[in-house]
Amino acid sequence: MSSVSLVASAELPTPWGVFTMTGFKEEATGKDHVALSMGDITTDAPVLARIHSECLTGDALFSLRCDCGFQLQAALQRIAKEERGVLLYVRQEGRGIGLLNKIHAYHLQDQGADTVEANEALGFAPDLRDYTICADMLKLLDVKSLRLMTNNPRKIKAMEKYGIPVAERVPLEEGKNAYNEFYLATKAGKLGHMLHD
C-alpha cells in the first residue's frame, strides 16, 4: 500500500518554464507534498530528479544560513534546461523537526552549536526525514529510475531501498557563502554529504 495518494495536477508557470504540479496527500500524517515535473518522465530513460525538503527560511525568505533556496532554484533551472525531470517538494521542514523547532535550533546555532548538535540538544536525531513517501510519489508518477541531484548519500540509499534505481548522482553544490560555511562543513563532516569545497 502506498504511503501517499495522488490528489490533483495542474500547470505551474515559473521563470524557467511551465511545470506540471502534482499534489499528494501523505496518508499517515495528512501532510501535503508536491511534485513539479516537465516532459515525459514515464519513459525508461533515467529522469533528472531532485528530492527537496521544505525550507521556508531558505526557499521563501531567502536565508543565507543554508543552501536550500539556491539548490531549489538550480534544480528547477536544470530540469527546465533538459525539458524533462521531476522535483519532489516534501513537507519535512528542518530535516523533519518542523519550523518552530528549527527556529529553536537556529537560536542554539547562534550560540555556537552546529546543526547536528542543535537538533540533538532539542531531543531530535540529526535527520528525521522519511524518504518512503518520495519513492511512493515517484511510483505514482510512473518514474522508473533517476539521475538524482543530491549531495546526500542517504537519499540515494533510500531510493534504491524503496525500489527506485539511481542511475547517476548529479552533484548540486550551490549557494556557499560566509553565513553557511559552518553549516555546509557540518553536513559534510557529520552527515556524510558529498561536498567538494
Curated annotation (Swiss-Prot):
GO terms for cellular component: cytosol. Zn(2+) binds at residues 55, 66, 68. It catalyses: GTP + 4 H2O = 2,5-diamino-6-hydroxy-4-(5-phosphoribosylamino)-pyrimidine + formate + 2 phosphate + 3 H(+). Keywords: GTP-binding, Hydrolase, Metal-binding, Nucleotide-binding, Riboflavin biosynthesis, Zinc. Its EC number is 3.5.4.25. Pfam families: GTP_cyclohydro2 (PF00925). InterPro entries: GTP_cyclohydro_II, RibA, RibA-like_sf. Gene3D superfamilies: GTP cyclohydrolase II (3.40.50.10990). The active site is at residues 127, 129. GTP binds at residues 50-54, 71, 93-95, 115, 150, 155. One of its GO terms (molecular function) is zinc ion binding. Binds 1 zinc ion per subunit. It comes from the Bacteria. GO terms for biological process: riboflavin biosynthetic process. Pathway: Cofactor biosynthesis; riboflavin biosynthesis; 5-amino-6-(D-ribitylamino)uracil from GTP: step 1/4. Its cofactor is Zn(2+). Catalyzes the conversion of GTP to 2,5-diamino-6-ribosylamino-4(3H)-pyrimidinone 5'-phosphate (DARP), formate and pyrophosphate. Belongs to the GTP cyclohydrolase II family. This is GTP cyclohydrolase-2. It comes from Tolumonas auensis (strain DSM 9187 / NBRC 110442 / TA 4). The gene is ribA.
